[in-house]
Every structure is written in structure tokens, then in C-alpha cells.
Regions:
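The feature marks non-catalytic terminal segments
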Residues: 31-36, 186-277
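Non-transmembrane alpha-helical segments in soluble domains
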Residues: 105, 168, 220-224
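Internal alpha/beta domain cores that form substrate/cofactor-binding pockets in large enzymes
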Residues: 70, 114-196, 204
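Extreme N-terminal basic, low-complexity initiation segments
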Residues: 2-8
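Short, solvent-exposed loop/turn segments at secondary-structure junctions
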Residues: 76-78, 153-154, 198-199, 215
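Short helix-coil transition/hinge motifs at the ends and kinks of transmembrane helices
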Residues: 85-91, 181, 251-255
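Active-site rim/loop-helix segments in enzyme catalytic domains that contact anionic ligands
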Residues: 11, 20-142, 266, 274-275
Length: 277
């Protein structure tokens, strides 16, 4: 109960202060109906800003619910995702990496997640067997209840699907009894692909809409940490509003729940349930 009350106190800071009393009450009731427990989640991000744009709301929301959320950034996006920094002149790759590291750490702290960096490079992102084993070891350590990563296809950025395949292959290795025998293996956490920049070209179709209204302000604060990609701030604000409208429509426009902002995900594996409601 102490943990639940602490979560609710934190939640108050994340909610808008005017015009959302009904939303606040509904969200508090939802938090109270999900007891805080030792649960965890893993986010595998190709570049150091991807987890913020595409899953920042999910991270903040589950952190509020008591999940330990851990982010793995495979690269800093130092070559292909830091144009604004390079245009300043007199920049080096190491200097760009340092800026990107600090941005991602600040964003993760706002969202309530821990973060680590594999620093395997970008444009192109490439991974050897040791990198795969390193990620499998993260799975073993975190024991995630669910995983968030990139779409399986992205013709605009080959780093993204490679990150997705790494996340899934490492999951399989972490499930194998013969990999580091004696360690606790990973179960079968569901994997959700977060929204790519241009979903129509990525064969990505959402089947999960997540209400992130209660944590939107936190997500936008995290977005603003990404100074190297300021041109994307308002784009992802529009995406969140659009997904919020769609989420509201999918629960029925007469529903009392006031959804404003949302995130969308595509599940890879079937959901196993005892209740279809």
C-alpha cells in the first residue's frame, strides 16, 4: 500500500492541473487496481533517441505502475541522427557521442528508466555474436515481462530492423537452457514493435493503442532533451494526438475515459489469455 500511495503521489505531478479532474480520478483508479510488484520491462533502441519518440509514454506509464524499465541503446546515432550537432562545426564523433549520451540519460531519468549504451555504431549499425550474447545477458539480468523495440521492416533506416532482429534473437538465446547453464532463463515476454517514422512503408500495422495521457507532459519533457533532433519534437506531438484520437474512438466516443495522447504498437506474438473481454 505504501508503494501504491507513492505511485499516486508521483502521478499527481504528471497530470495537467486544470480541466482533467475526471482523467485524474480514472487514472488513479487504474493505478490502484494494478498493485505494484517486482515487474520489469526492456526497451531495445537502435539509436539513443528512438526510445523517447516512440515509447516514452509507455516507459513513463509502466514506471508509474511499479515496473523497473531498462533501456538498451545500441548506438548513439552519432553519424546519422545528429545532423544539428554536426552543423555546429568543430565537432568530433566522440564529442557528438557524449552529447547524445547526456541527452538520453536525461530523458531516461525523466521517464523513470535506467539506460545503458552498447556503442556499436550507426549508419551502419552492425552486431557480432558477442553483441548478441551481451544483449542476451541483459535479458537474463532484467527478466523482462515485456519488450519494446523497432518494426521488422524499415526501408528508410536499416539500423531499425536490425535492432528489432537483435532484440528477438537475444530473447530466444536467453530462453535456452544450454546458454550459460545454471542461470535463470527468460520466460516468453511479449514483444511489441513501436511505431516507425513512416509506418505505411514499413509493413507496420498497430494492434495495441496505449493511453499515455497521464504521462504526456513527462514524455514531452523527455523529447525536449533531444536537442540534436529538435525538428522531430512537434512531429511526435502530432503522432501522439492522432493516436489518442484513435484510442478514444476504439473504446467508444461515449466512454467516460478522456484519452488525449496515445502510443501505438504492433505485437509479434499471439496473446494468451483466459478472458477475451
Amino acid at each position: 500500500n505504501i508503494n501504491k500511495n507513492h505511485s499516486l503521489r508521483k502521478l499527481t505531478n504528471y497530470l495537467p492541473t486544470t480541466g482533467h479532474d475526471k482523467l485524474k480520478k480514472t487514472t488513479e483508479e487504474a493505478i490502484m487496481s494494478h498493485p505494484v510488484s517486482e515487474k520489469s520491462a526492456l526497451v531495445v533502441s537502435a539509436h539513443s533517441a528512438d526510445f523517447v519518440w516512440r515509447a516514452g509514454g509507455a516507459i513513463a506509464l509502466h514506471a508509474l505502475q511499479g515496473y523497473q524499465v531498462h533501456v538498451v541503446c545500441l548506438s548513439f546515432g552519432e553519424r546519422g541522427e545528429s545532423a544539428k550537432l554536426w552543423r555546429k562545426g568543430n565537432m568530433t564523433e566522440e564529442a557528438v557521442k557524449q552529447v547524445r549520451r547526456e541527452e538520453a540519460q536525461a530523458a531516461a531519468a525523466i521517464l523513470g528508466a535506467s539506460v545503458e549504451f552498447f556503442d556499436i555504431g550507426d549508419y551502419p549499425l552492425r552486431a557480432d555474436k558477442e553483441t548478441l550474447f551481451r544483449l542476451a545477458d541483459v535479458y537474463r539480468r532484467i527478466q523482462p515481462h515485456f519488450v519494446l523495440t523497432h518494426s521488422l521492416h524499415d526501408p528508410y533506416n536499416y539500423d531499425h530492423p536490425l535492432a528489432s532482429h537483435l532484440a528477438q534473437e537475444a530473447r530466444i538465446i536467453a530462453q535456452a537452457e544450454g546458454y550459460r547453464p545454471g542461470e535463470k532463463i527468460v520466460a516468453a515476454p511479449p514483444v511489441y514493435c513501436f511505431e516507425p517514422h513512416q509506418p505505411e512503408q514499413c509493413n507496420w500495422k498497430p494492434d495495441v493503442l496505449l493511453d499515455i495521457t497521464a504521462v504526456w507532459e513527462k514524455k514531452y519533457q523527455a523529447i525536449q532533451c533531444m536537442q540534436g533532433q529538435e525538428h522531430l519534437w512537434e512531429y511526435y506531438t502530432r503522432v501522439a494526438l492522432q493516436r489518442g484520437v484513435q484510442a478514444k474512438r476504439n473504446i467508444g466516443i461515449t466512454a467516460a475515459r478522456d484519452i488525449v495522447h496515445g502510443e501505438a504498437f504492433q505485437s509479434i506474438f499471439p496473446r494468451v489469455t483466459e478472458n477475451l473481454a
